Amino acid sequence: MRNIKLHPIAAAAIAILLMVQCRVVENTVVMEDVDVRSWTDAATVKYINDDTTTLRNLSVTLHVNRLYDSKEIALEISTMTPDSLRHTELVVMPAAADWPSEIATTTDIEIPYREGVRFRCKGEYVVRITPRKKVVGVEAAGINFQSKR
C-alpha cells in the first residue's frame, strides 16, 4: 500500500469542499400558541437573523388537532424588519391536514410561503400571522425558516 502525501493547503481545500457538500440544512421553526377554540388574533413570532447572505425558504406551520377541518386558509402575514420596514400581504393557501394515523390527535401542516428569501438586515424580524376569519382546531401557528441549499 502506497502512502500519499498531500500538501497542507490541498488537504485543507479538500476538507472544506467535503464540509460544504455535507453541510446540514439549518431549519428554525418559531411558533406561538393560539386559541384552539377560535383562532382570530395574530400569532406573533420573532426570528433573529445573523446571516445576510444565505437564502431561505419560508413555510407557514400550523399545529392542529382533530377539530381542524379546513382545506384552505386565508391569512394576513405582516413582517417588520430590524430597520422598521413593514410588509403586509393577504394570502389564501391550501391547508388540509394529513393525519399520520387514525389515532393521532394532532399533526403539523407545513405550507410553502416564500422561496429564496434573503434577510438583508441583521437583527430581529417580527412576523404576525392573522387568520382572515375564525379558525377552529389550530393550537399553534408559526414560520419555518429553512436555509436553501
Language-model region placement:
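C-terminal motif of bacterial Sec signal peptides marking the signal peptidase cleavage site
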Residues: 18-21
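Exposed low-complexity, polar/acidic, P/S/T/G-rich flexible segments that act as propeptides
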Residues: 79-80, 133-149
